[in-house]
Amino acid sequence: MVDNMFIVFEGIDGSGKTTQSKLLAKKMDAFWTYEPSNSLVGKIIREILSGKTEVDNKTLALLFAADRIEHTKLIKEELKKRDVVCDRYLYSSIAYQSVAGVDENFIKSINRYALKPDIVFLLIVDIETALKRVKTKDIFEKKDFLKKVQDKYLELAEEYNFIVIDTTKKSVEEVHNEIIGYLKNIPH
């Protein structure tokens, strides 16, 4: 029996993760999912990110961890049947919340149950380009903050061996083909 793959896309808003994760899921006939999830906790997180409700950054980190517990159950169930492609996962929490001032070790400790992805694609982009691409504004979309988050993602890429793809000057098709090229070289 071939194990199904858990593939994660990370990057700041406007990097192309949602577009690319959906394209890949369609091509692979995989289950597509995202964080924050559709759980009750995920809906609360979206309220906070939209600026409708305010909470402490540590509280937000805990909410993301709680949402991830529920989400991981769904991912594990789907992996029994097919590949899973996820738009954001644990590394978004580490990048965004640590830049917002939450201790990185705290974030990692409350997420220690998280499923380890088989592969993580980090899509990076010029900050100006990202801001032009973004359709919805949330509390994290400030230029200097996004730069710090992307820098943190690049640190995580070193630590966790992400595949980094710069989407700034590439078409959707070029990025998709690059992703497919990487996947062809992975035993599956």
UniProtKB/Swiss-Prot annotation:
CDD domains: TMPK
Keyword Kinase attributed: yes
Binding site for ATP: G11, I12, D13, G14, S15, G16, K17, T18
Enzyme Commission no: 2.7.4.9
Statement: the UniProt record of this protein carries the keyword Kinase: yes
Any one GO molecular function term: dTMP kinase activity
GO biological process, any: dTDP biosynthetic process
Pfam family, one: Thymidylate_kin
Reactions this protein catalyses: dTMP + ATP = dTDP + ADP
UniProt keyword terms in alphabetical order: ATP-binding, Kinase, Nucleotide biosynthesis, Nucleotide-binding, Transferase
Gene Ontology CC terms: cytoplasm
Family: Belongs to the thymidylate kinase family.
HAMAP family to which the protein is assigned, alphabetical: Thymidylate_kinase
Protein name stated in the entry: Probable thymidylate kinase
Highest classification ranks of the organism: Archaea, Methanobacteriati, Methanobacteriota, Methanomada group, Methanococci
